[in-house]
Structures are given as structure tokens and as C-alpha cells.
């Protein structure tokens, strides 16, 4: 089964994302910030990470930078899901190692398309 880790400080976004992902056949886990997300990845590397930008403790950019610097071959696809919608943020995310970028709010179809673009859904 495909696995996805949702890293977002919003309980509502995690709930909505979980519902969409489960209908697409993903087993879903959650983290409230980048630090929890990194810990979850080290315990069990997911296939995909849905990642928020602005979170307490550790931001999405800090998360992806540390994740991509870790040794080893297992690296998940990372889709930023954020309200940061300017070109500078998109470039920064892609440069840091993001595979896709989707603006909040998003719907089922948009998320499904983004997941297809990174090889899932």
C-alpha cells in the first residue's frame, strides 16, 4: 500500500488531506510540525510527504532541507501544500528538493493530479 505523511500544523488541513488520500488508497500518518515529520520519516520512510510551509518548531523548508541531506537511498516524494503562492516561494521549495507544489485551499482533483505528477495516485 502507498504511504503518505501529512506534515501540517492545521488539524483541519490534516483531516481534509487524510480523507482525500485515503480515498486514493494511501495509508496515512500525520505530524504537526517539521521536527515530528522528520522523526516519523526516520521511523518509517513514507512514499510521499504533503508538507506545509509555515509551522512552529521547524518549517517546511527546514524539514525538506534536512530530509534531503540525510544519507541513504530512501527519499520520499515531497509535495508542498501551502498558502505561500508567490514565485519566490515556489522556486525556494523546488530548489530545496520539493517534487511538486500545490496552493491551499486545494480540492480532491487538484491533489490527485499533483500526486500523479510525482508518480502516485
How would you name each of these model-derived features?
Residues 15-23:
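Charged docking surfaces used in two-component/phosphorelay signaling
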Residues 30-39, 60:
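Helix N-cap/capping motif at the beta->alpha junctions
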Residues 39, 61-74:
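Short amphipathic alpha-helix used as the core "switch/output" element in two-component signaling
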Residues 44-50:
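Active-site beta3 strand of CheY-like receiver
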Residues 55:
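Receiver (REC) domain active-site loop signature in two-component systems and cognate sites
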Residues 62, 85-100, 110:
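Alpha4 helix (beta4-alpha4-beta5 surface) of REC/receiver domains from two-component response regulators
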Residues 106-115:
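C-terminal output helix
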Amino acid at each position: 500500500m502507498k504511504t503518505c505523511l501529512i506534515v501540517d500544523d492545521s488539524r483541519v488541513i490534516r483531516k481534509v488531506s487524510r480523507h482525500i488520500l485515503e480515498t486514493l488508497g494511501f495509508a496515512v500518518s500525520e505530524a504537526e510540525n517539521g521536527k515530528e515529520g522528520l522523526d516519523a520519516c526516520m521511523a518509517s520512510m513514507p512514499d510521499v510527504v504533503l508538507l506545509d510551509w509555515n509551522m512552529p518548531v521547524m518549517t517546511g523548508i527546514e524539514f525538506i532541507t534536512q530530509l534531503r541531506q540525510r544519507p541513504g537511498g530512501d527519499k520520499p516524494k515531497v509535495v508542498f501544500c501551502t498558502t505561500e503562492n508567490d514565485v519566490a516561494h515556489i522556486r525556494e521549495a523546488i530548489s530545496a528538493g520539493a517534487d511538486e507544489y500545490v496552493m491551499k485551499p486545494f480540492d480532491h482533483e487538484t491533489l490527485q493530479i499533483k500526486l500523479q505528477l510525482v508518480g502516485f495516485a
